[in-house]
Amino acid sequence: MAKAKSSRSKSTSRSKAVRSKTGGAKTKRAGGIHRELKERLILAGKVLVAEGQDDFTRGHISFRLPDDPNLFFMKPHSIGLDEITMENILTIDLEGNVVAGKARRHSEVYIHSEILKARPDVNCVIHTHPTYATALSSTGRGLKCYSQPGALFYDALGTYTDTINLIRTQEMGAGVARALGDGRGVLLKNHGVVVIGASIEETVIGIIMLENGAMVQLLVEAAGEAAPEFPREDIEKLKHDISRAEQFVVNFDYLVRRVKRRG
């Protein structure tokens, strides 16, 4: 009997040791993934500023944690998009509560939390105040496909008109999520834009393309006689061609290299 107990005790100890090692390995892997994501967020912030998406310390970017879909990393308040660091990135839950990090969170955190809550397919959310897209949001007109960048948001761009003020409550954030629907972005009337994606690369390139599409549209309309949009079948084919994941990565990596060359 004593030998049986001893055998069970040794077996239990071995099981605990295996679980401990397995848990430690998982934690280590998660830590490595988290670090890579934070590094990508830092690069994304620098690219956004280089592409004219900055507005002092306003604007924010978030990314859902792959190992816990109820948490996301987010840029903190009071710094520019190009000042994101490993140390100041916040970890936030889907109710907008900071669960890790000492910096102050953005009051518009609910744009991110409510979209991530409503859209399990979305991992990255960016909100900025780009000049042309914000101007377009103020006209009450949607984005037309006068250029290739505009095709990316064809039938995929909502409009939020409930307020022109900051999105500071869960209810307002939920309103933005409803305006987004199953689309790729939202024009916030007289305010700015929100763009989403499955990856950081897709979302950064998407918000840059939205601004380019809005710029072309406003220039065309300012010329006095708007050209007709592309035929629907052409737009849908073009949208498919420019929506491939590898294209987003290639273009994002190019912009990162350009930022690094410029110092």
Residue ranges with predicted function:
Residues A2-K10, R14-G263:
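Glycine-rich flexible loops
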